[in-house]
């Protein structure tokens, strides 16, 4: 009986992996491609993931003629809700929201388009073996500080006292890093006065946060380079708590808590913000596809054309080497003043660009980009 159950579980797991695997990313879509109403745009966007959708919404709201092309039959990229089993819908890849900046939600009016956060409380549950040293006790971490402290105290009173200080330390480091992430990256030294002043304001905000909390810069340097286990061992003594927190350092990465640099992911997981609460991640009502759907609705409202089942075969270049449009797999040609790539560098430079248009050294670097941890 047990063998049959194991076989059934293995078959179910194999089916899940086939359905949920990212390798289906470029699988042909069953739907038909509906050509956009025009063949000439200000901007063509390659890829209908959340980044491409946000770009489409902002550019269209700025008055530009935008056409977004997505190969799959559903928009959202990794932020999608799909029926992987009959009657059951899942967030297929991305499963939590938190790094979506609040100004994007406000400026694109995503709440009006149906976007809703669902608080994640408790945020984690860690059971222990009934016959183990902890006698089946479980650890719950959540929003209620007193309840969290009581749960941690089951395993260590010292850890219960240290945990708020650990969270405050991460928030202090977050305050230093966050201003630098809220602006566009510097693309050249020839930026205008407004761009340079904006960068200066962000640096000053970061510096003020660092000066307000002595030791934060040293902590940031350590989080960027040290193993997560090194950080957690210094703060806590309970293996149950350390194992729970270590999941933040390894989730979505082929690494271990003792890998140098894994501590950065501890910081990454407090960079989130949901419903105005820093350091918090949340579910999305309707799954992650509902987030993509809200952004798509904002883009369409601004007159962006979002095309699914649009299989781009080639980026077209003008005589100077600049992008001037795309050719679809069926032969149709769309032209634009600019082409924005919201797809992977591998797909863009190795599959869509003419080989002689990509410098050999750059092409070699792109060929060796490792996607195995994403």
Listing of model-derived features with the role each one plays in the protein:
Residues 281-302, 315-316, 326-374:
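Glycine-rich loop(s) and the adjacent beta-strand/alpha-helix scaffold that form part
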Residues 1-28:
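N-terminal mitochondrial targeting presequence
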Residues 244-247, 251-282:
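Active-site-adjacent "gating/activation" loops or surface patches in catalytic cores
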Residues 216-230, 274-297, 307-309:
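Short beta-strand to alpha-helix junction loop
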Residues 307-324:
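A conserved short coil-to-beta-strand element within the FAD-binding core of flavoproteins
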């Amino acid at each position: 009986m047990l063998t049959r159950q194991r076989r059934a579980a293995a078959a179910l797991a194999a089916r899940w992996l086939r359905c949920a695997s990212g390798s289906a990313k470029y699988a042909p879509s069953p739907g038909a491609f509906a050509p956009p109403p025009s063949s000439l745009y200000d901007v063509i966007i390659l890829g209908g993931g959340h980044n491409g959708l946000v770009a489409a919404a902002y550019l269209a709201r700025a008055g530009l003629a935008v056409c977004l092309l997505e190969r799959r039959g559903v928009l959202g990229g990794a932020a999608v809700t799909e029926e992987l089993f009959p009657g059951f819908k899942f967030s297929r890849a991305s499963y939590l929201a938190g790094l979506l900046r609040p100004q994007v939600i406000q400026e694109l009016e995503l709440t009006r388009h149906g976007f809703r956060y669902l608080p994640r409380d408790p945020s984690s549950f860690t059971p222990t073996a009934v016959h183990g040293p902890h006698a089946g006790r479980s650890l719950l971490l959540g929003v209620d500080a007193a309840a969290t402290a009581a749960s941690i105290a089951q395993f260590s009173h010292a850890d219960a006292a240290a945990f708020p200080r650990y969270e405050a330390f991460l928030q202090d480091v977050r305050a230093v890093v966050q201003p630098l992430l809220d602006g566009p990256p510097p693309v050249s030294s020839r930026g205008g006065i407004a761009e340079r002043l904006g960068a200066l304001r962000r640096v000053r905000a970061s510096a003020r946060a660092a000066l307000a909390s002595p030791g934060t810069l040293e902590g940031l340097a350590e989080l960027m380079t040290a193993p997560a286990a090194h950080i957690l061992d210094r703060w806590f003594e309970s293996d149950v708590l350390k194992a729970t927190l270590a999941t933040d350092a390894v989730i979505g990465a082929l690494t271990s808590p003792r890998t140098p640099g894994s501590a950065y992911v501890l910081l990454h997981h407090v960079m989130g913000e949901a419903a105005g609460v820093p350091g918090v991640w949340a579910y999305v009502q309707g799954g992650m596809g509902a987030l993509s759907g809200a952004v798509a609705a904002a883009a369409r409202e601004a007159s962006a054309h979002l095309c699914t089942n649009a299989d781009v075969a080639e980026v077209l270049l003008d005589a100077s080497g600049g992008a001037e449009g795309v050719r679809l797999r069926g032969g149709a040609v769309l032209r634009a003043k600019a082409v924005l790539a919201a797809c992977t560098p591998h797909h863009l430079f190795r599959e869509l660009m003419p080989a002689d248009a990509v410098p050999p050294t750059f092409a070699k670097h792109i060929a060796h980009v490792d996607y195995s941890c994403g």
